[in-house]
Design a protein with these regions (language model features):
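Alpha/beta catalytic barrel-like cores
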Residues: 1-155, 159, 167-170, 175-179, ...
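Aromatic-lined carbohydrate-recognition surfaces of secreted/lumenal glycan-active proteins
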Residues: 155-160, 198-212
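Active-site-adjacent pocket scaffolds in enzyme catalytic domains
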Residues: 163
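Extended, H/D-rich, highly charged conserved domains that either
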Residues: 184-198
């Protein structure tokens, strides 16, 4: 990956958009976005996935989703509205910066989940390869809309890398594609889809909703294998 692809948790000189409303619980609302897609159904014959942290504390059960037999996923049918929310938040940021509340030179940071995040959380493992390319196309379309609407030199984009980290630590069931290959290919693709004028970062996280570790692993996992 190019040198501009950082792995810092925060980007110096930026202020992040506020996550409220449906985004208060990060990407949890994407479960319903996927369930509402005409090509996806609830896998009622498959046990729900229990989202729990390392000590067994459980936060919720997630009904598993799958692609309907014979259906074809289409990026045009995915409606996350990330671009709309970012552009709306930008207007407030821009006004506050013009008023001097936010210092000049501070960039507006837009944080987005990777396509792997809702896929690993919600889909049956066998259908991951069907959904990831579709979500990738959709999310890069959202990035393109943001890049066209906002001044690229005044914004920063952050791909939140969480599910990839806990997958690397053995949290998820294996799928048909090795998660290491899937992760590396995905992070490169979504990074390459961000215009060069936009500052880009990849923060790595394995925190639960309780701000504790999801995995019990104490030894850092090498991403160079």
């Amino acid at each position: 990956m190019a040198s501009r692809h950082g792995s810092n948790r925060t980007v110096p000189g930026t202020t992040a958009e506020r996550r409220d409303g449906i985004r208060r619980t990060w990407n949890r609302f994407l479960q319903q976005v996927l369930a509402d897609n005409p090509a996806i159904e609830v896998a009622s014959d498959v046990p729900s996935s229990k989202f729990a942290q390392w000590d067994g504390k459980s936060f919720r059960e997630i009904p598993r989703l799958r692609v309907q037999p014979g259906a074809r996923l289409d990026p045009a049918t995915v409606k996350t509205h990330y671009a709309d929310m970012a552009i709306e938040s930008w207007r407030l940021f821009d006004r506050l910066q013009q008023e001097g509340v936010i210092p000049a030179g501070i960039k507006f940071q837009i944080s987005l989940p990777t396509p792997i995040a809702p896929t690993y959380n919600n889909m049956v493992p066998t259908d991951r390869p069907a959904l990831i390319p579709v979500l990738t196309a959709h999310m890069l379309g959202e990035v393109a809309t943001i890049a066209q609407a906002l001044p690229n030199d005044r914004i920063a984009l952050q791909w939140d890398v969480c599910q990839e980290v806990i997958a690397w630590e053995g949290y998820y069931e294996p799928g048909p594609v090795d998660f290491r290959k899937e992760t590396i290919a995905e992070l490169i693709a979504i990074g390459d889809g961000v215009p060069a004028a936009i500052e880009l970062s990849y923060p790595l996280c394995n925190s639960s909703p309780a701000d504790e570790h999801v995995s019990s692993r104490r030894t850092p996992v090498s991403w160079s294998r």
